[in-house]
């Protein structure tokens, strides 16, 4: 998921 990837780079 896009949101999951966004959180992954946090």
From Swiss-Prot:
Biological processes per GO annotation: neuropeptide signaling pathway
GO-annotated cellular components: extracellular region
Top-level taxon in the UniProt lineage: Eukaryota
Location of Methionine amide modifications: 10
Principal place of residence: secreted
Keywords: Amidation, Neuropeptide, Secreted
Protein name (record): Neurokinin-A
Organism: Pelophylax ridibundus (Marsh frog)
Function noted in UniProt: Tachykinins are active peptides which excite neurons, evoke behavioral responses, are potent vasodilators and secretagogues, and contract (directly or indirectly) many smooth muscles.
Family: Belongs to the tachykinin family.
InterPro entries listed in its UniProt record: Tachy_Neuro_lke_CS
Keyword Ribonucleoprotein attributed: no
Compartments it resides in: Secreted
């Amino acid at each position: 998921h896009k949101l999951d990837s966004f959180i992954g780079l946090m």
